[in-house]
From Swiss-Prot:
This is Holliday junction branch migration complex subunit RuvB. It holds the Pfam family AAA_lid_4. The RuvA-RuvB-RuvC complex processes Holliday junction (HJ) DNA during genetic recombination and DNA repair, while the RuvA-RuvB complex plays an important role in the rescue of blocked DNA replication forks via replication fork reversal (RFR). RuvA specifically binds to HJ cruciform DNA, conferring on it an open structure. The RuvB hexamer acts as an ATP-dependent pump, pulling dsDNA into and through the RuvAB complex. RuvB forms 2 homohexamers on either side of HJ DNA bound by 1 or 2 RuvA tetramers; 4 subunits per hexamer contact DNA at a time. Mg(2+) binds at T71. Homohexamer. Forms an RuvA(8)-RuvB(12)-Holliday junction (HJ) complex. HJ DNA is sandwiched between 2 RuvA tetramers; dsDNA enters through RuvA and exits via RuvB. An RuvB hexamer assembles on each DNA strand where it exits the tetramer. Each RuvB hexamer is contacted by two RuvA subunits (via domain III) on 2 adjacent RuvB subunits; this complex drives branch migration. In the full resolvosome a probable DNA-RuvA(4)-RuvB(12)-RuvC(2) complex forms which resolves the HJ. Gene3D superfamilies: 1.10.8.60, P-loop containing nucleotide triphosphate hydrolases, Winged helix-like DNA-binding domain superfamily/Winged helix DNA-binding domain.
Length: 343
């Protein structure tokens, strides 16, 4: 769990390099946040209204593929409200006591951020319901005939949940979030803005055409954009003059295995598995996962959304299928007859 307040700064000597850099690049206000315009504009209104009334913001649920800024929005909301933020994740809350410890340490109007909230176990999730609805904990003391119920009042707080798998949330939990927003992939222009902002913070000279090239290969995802920028900085410092030019960006991205379409080695491995081993599909995701040596959840959460968004993959009731664009990408001849009906 990470706990921070608006005036807090994380101690740099205890953070791994990537975590420290990610924290330094994270926007701290709505004005610094790039992209997701409709979502941000609504959140500004909700936050301003809650702040003017002196109330806790309604509970929020942010969904969407990984790396689009759900965690950043949670931190921004806490900063804009001027309250503390307590950060944890669904898998970390194994027992009711884990959740009770967090909730009883909240101050009035604080933000509790639960990442991967779809991975909460059922017992912990049910324990959360009265806390969300009535700001109350229902605790059972002792067991058997001596058991007795005890209610603990909690200060009003805001729960912000983040998920990449909205469909795995139970209806009772999902319905308790009064604010629900989905984050979408970023366009290239927004990613260019993020690149230039990050480059300024890190002190990296970055040419405009180089930023355009990196943005086009970033899968519409700011986290990937910033990760690529850090790797290009390494190439620029070791093999160049410290400046990221278009030529250096193109050569370095090629060496990193990120092509002009934004596909990386695992994307290509997944698609080639469908094409070469299973005749273009349909094939089940479990079979794909076993063939490429990757977890099913990772394929569904990280790789498939982008591949489907870009038209490289089709999901059908019978399994995953390659598309005509996939055959064109690999310069392969598509099958002469339909591979099967969707019905």
């Amino acid at each position: 769990m990470v706990m921070a307040r608006k005036s807090d700064t994380l101690s740099e000597d205890v953070l791994p390099e990537d975590v420290r850099l990610e924290a330094s690049l994270r926007p701290r206000s709505f004005d610094e946040y790039v992209g997701q315009g409709p979502v941000v504009e609504k959140l500004k209104v909700y936050v301003q209204a809650a702040r003017s009334r002196g109330e806790a913001l309604d509970h929020c649920l942010f969904s969407g593929p990984p790396g689009l800024g759900k965690t950043s929005l949670a931190h921004i909301i806490a900063n804009e409200l001027g309250v503390g933020i307590h950060v944890t994740s669904g898998p970390a809350l194994e027992r009711k006591g884990d959740l009770a410890g967090l909730l009883t340490n909240l101050d009035a109007r604080d933000v509790l951020f639960i990442d991967e909230i779809h991975r909460l176990n059922a017992a912990v999730e049910e324990y959360l319901y009265p806390a969300m609805e009535d700001f109350r904990l229902d605790i059972t003391i002792d067991t058997g005939p001596a058991a007795r119920a005890m209610k603990i009042d909690l200060p009003p707080f805001t729960l912000i949940g983040a998920t990449t798998r909205t469909g795995l949330l139970t209806s009772p939990l999902r319905d308790r979030f009064q604010i629900q927003e989905r984050l979408e992939y970023y366009d290239a222009k927004a990613l260019e803005s993020i690149l230039h902002r990050s480059a300024r913070i890190l002190g990296i000279p970055l040419d405009k055409d180089a930023a355009r090239e990196v943005a086009s290969r970033s899968r519409g995802t700011p986290r990937i954009t910033n990760r690529l920028l850090r790797r290009l900085r390494d190439f620029a410092e070791v093999e160049g003059n410290g400046r990221i030019t278009l030529e250096l960006a193109q050569k370095s991205l090629d060496r990193l295995g990120v092509d002009a379409s934004g596909l990386d080695s695992m994307d290509r491995k997944i698609l080639l598995t469908i094409l070469d081993k299973f005749g273009g599909g349909p094939v089940g995701v479990e079979t794909i996962a076993a063939s490429v040596g990757e977890q099913r959840d990772t394929i569904e959460d990280v790789y498939e959304p982008f591949l489907m968004q870009e038209g490289f993959l089709q999901r059908t009731p019978r399994g995953r299928m390659a598309t005509h664009r996939t055959y064109q990408y690999f310069k392969k001849q598509p099958p002469p007859t339909p591979q099967g009906s969707l019905f």
